[in-house]
């Protein structure tokens, strides 16, 4: 039973089994041909023999309504099929013989979504929390860094975005570690520099190094990987700390180079290499303790956006939970420990946890002997020693915390440098031992 199909273009002639073996069934649904076409049948075929049954395909005046399709139509949902079983079209490519592969992009053999995109969308996780690998990220810190980095990769109308973000604050407050957590959260592998690289015996070497690292990060961005330039302790390498530091030519060139990059972030050239091609813009994140020691034009608002990091009580508790996360310390004990030391930096609690292991190390040394420590730790066939995790109670933590605080007080109180200049005696060095009763033991 052949039927002639007439369309605007050339349409292949095909055999259409309109009835099968029974009677009364209509031709194939117009949904088979797409949503924008409809079928006009001149007459209904009453029996299995079709003499000259012809139908015409013309453009539809309106979209096909699902209510017009009958339940008996086996192809009624084919035009709207976006089910996952169509993934089999692409999964078989390259895995089975081409004889058994369905033709691509022909008829119904059209993958609604590729397998890679389907799996990626199915496995994607949207993490908007401020926890990374069990470590706490302060919400204000996360917000500042993510917004600054995102702005530098956007094209905002008539907006000059500062290239440099300066994170500064007290010592030991976790500025660098919080930055690294944010980078890990965003999937960024930063190009890192330290203050020690901002000085050299050769004039101009640090400035050239900054440009090299910047262009290295720019090349990574061109390859489709988000990257930033991260400089630790900028004020220690480029700042002036009173009369104890000497301002060198390299300090001047480092400041001038950062100012120039902030003004022209897409035109950073190396000495002797000048090309007209613009490089990708790279956000710069710097940390420091006191930005007032830096060159004032460098830290002006158009070049550097400044963020003073002063963790709140909630931030300190959150970070300490991450520090003691594997030790089984109750949350109420962590809160009490933090509240009893409000003036201490966050790094204090990390040093406190490390101090608790002193007893375990002391036991191990007494077991192997002092003379065998080197053989057991360096290139030992037995491997490094392992310890059972010590139980950390609040009383033990408070005891070691008081010891750390006492050492801090000794440094501030016993200033031997001033004593050496003023008198020949040792000052408070022996006086402490005499008062404590340990001098004559």
Swiss-Prot record:
Q: Does the keyword Transit peptide apply?
A: yes
Q: Which domain of life is it from?
A: Eukaryota
Residue ranges the record marks as coiled coil: none
Q: Which UniProt keywords apply?
A: ATP-binding, Chloroplast, Nucleotide-binding, Plastid, Transit peptide
Which coarse location class applies to the principal site listed for this UniProt protein? plastid
Q: Which GO cellular component terms are attached?
A: chloroplast stroma; thylakoid
Compartment(s) of residence: Plastid, Chloroplast stroma
| Molecular function, one GO term | ATP binding
Q: Which residues bind ATP?
A: 167-174
Q: Carries keyword Cell membrane?
A: no
| Family named by the database record | Belongs to the RuBisCO activase family.
Summarize the protein's role. Activation of RuBisCO (ribulose-1,5-bisphosphate carboxylase/oxygenase; EC 4.1.1.39) involves the ATP-dependent carboxylation of the epsilon-amino group of lysine leading to a carbamate structure.
What's this protein's name?
Ribulose bisphosphate carboxylase/oxygenase activase, chloroplastic
**Organism of derivation:** Phaseolus vulgaris
Q: Which gene encodes it?
A: RCA1
């Amino acid at each position: 039973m052949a039927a002639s199909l007439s369309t605007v273009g050339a349409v292949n002639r095909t055999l259409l089994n309109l009835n099968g073996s029974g009677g009364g069934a209509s031709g194939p649904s117009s949904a088979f041909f797409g949503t924008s076409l409809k079928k006009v049948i001149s007459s209904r075929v009453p029996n299995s023999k079709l003499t000259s049954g012809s139908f015409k395909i013309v453009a539809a005046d309106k979209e096909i309504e699902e209510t017009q399709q009958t339940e008996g139509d086996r192809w009624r949902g084919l035009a709207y099929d976006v089910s996952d079983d169509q993934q089999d079209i692409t999964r078989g490519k390259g895995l089975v013989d081409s004889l058994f592969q369905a033709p691509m992009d022909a008829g119904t053999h059209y993958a609604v979504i590729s397998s890679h995109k389907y799996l990626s969308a199915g496995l994607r996780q949207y993490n908007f929390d401020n926890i990374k690998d069990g470590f706490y990220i302060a919400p204000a810190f996360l917000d500042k860094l993510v917004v600054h980095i995102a702005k530098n990769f956007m094209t905002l109308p008539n907006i000059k975005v500062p290239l440099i973000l300066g994170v500064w604050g007290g010592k030991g407050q976790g500025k660098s570690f919080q930055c690294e957590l944010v980078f890990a959260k965003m999937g960024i592998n930063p190009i890192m520099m330290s203050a020690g690289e901002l000085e050299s015996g050769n004039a101009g070497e640090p400035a050239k190094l900054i440009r090299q690292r910047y262009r290295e990060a720019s090349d990574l961005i061109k390859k489709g990987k988000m990257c930033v330039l991260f400089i630790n302790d900028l004020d220690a390498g480029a700042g002036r700390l009173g009369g104890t530091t000497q301002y060198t030519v390299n300090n001047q060139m480092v400041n001038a180079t950062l100012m120039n990059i902030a003004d022209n972030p897409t035109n950073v050239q190396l000495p002797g290499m000048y090309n007209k091609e613009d490089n990708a813009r790279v956000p710069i994140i710097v940390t420091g303790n006191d930005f007032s020691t830096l060159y004032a034009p460098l830290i002006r608002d158009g070049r550097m956006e400044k963020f003073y990091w002063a963790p709140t009580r909630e931030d300190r508790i959150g970070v300490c939970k991450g520090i003691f996360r594997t030790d089984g310390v109750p949350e109420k004990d962590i809160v009490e420990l933090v509240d009893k030391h409000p003036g201490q930096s966050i790094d204090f609690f990390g040093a406190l946890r490390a101090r608790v292991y002193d007893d375990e190390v002391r036991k191990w040394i007494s077991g192997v002997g002092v003379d065998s420590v080197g053989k057991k730790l360096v290139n030992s066939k037995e491997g490094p020693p392992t310890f059972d995790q010590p139980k950390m109670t609040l009383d033990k933590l408070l005891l070691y915390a008081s010891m750390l605080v006492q050492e801090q007080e000794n440094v501030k109180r016993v200033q031997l440098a001033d004593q050496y200049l003023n008198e020949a005696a040792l000052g408070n060095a022996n006086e402490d031992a005499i008062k404590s009763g340990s001098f004559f033991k």
